[in-house]
Amino acid sequence: ALDLFSDLKILNFKSVKEDFRIIGEQVYTTDLIKNYVIGFQNRDTVIKEYSETPLFKVTTGTGFAPNNKNEGIRKNNFYGTYLLGPLLIRNPYLLEYFTKNLLKSKNVKYKAMLHDTAYQAYDAYLKNFVNKD
């Protein structure tokens, strides 16, 4: 998806096709929420040049390119990332952040919903793959 925006020149970055693939689970942090953001990447492009605000900082995995600790682009209400879905299902805290902000922009009060299974799956992933102690 980020490649499309690179070609359209809507945002200021350049995506380049490479001869290698970046495949695997990723763990990031963001200033949007205090919790980790988890996801999966499978791509053969890297971002070589960018001046947009990064969405994430790499904790484990790959950023825009190997040895780059930034990933994703954030500009106004646009959020772009190489992470594959189901991004919001795997990250209930991030889903809650976006839901609250969307409702707030429409002057609708947020009412927390019970989605214990999503939080349990998120916590289990972190326990098994990130905090292996």
Label each region the model flagged:
Residues A1-L32:
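Cysteine-nucleophile active-site neighborhood
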Residues F5-L8, E25, G39, N70, ...:
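Hydrophobic, well-ordered secondary-structure segments
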Residues I10, G39, F78-G80:
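Conserved beta-strand scaffold positions in the cores of enzyme catalytic domains, especially
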Residues F13, N42-T45, L83:
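Fold-independent oxyanion-binding glycine-rich loops
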Residues E18, V46-E49, P86-R90:
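Short, acidic Gly/Pro/Ser/Thr-rich loop/turn segments
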Residues V27-N76:
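Catalytic beta-strand/loop cores that center a nucleophilic Ser/Cys/Thr
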Residues N77-D133:
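Acyltransferase
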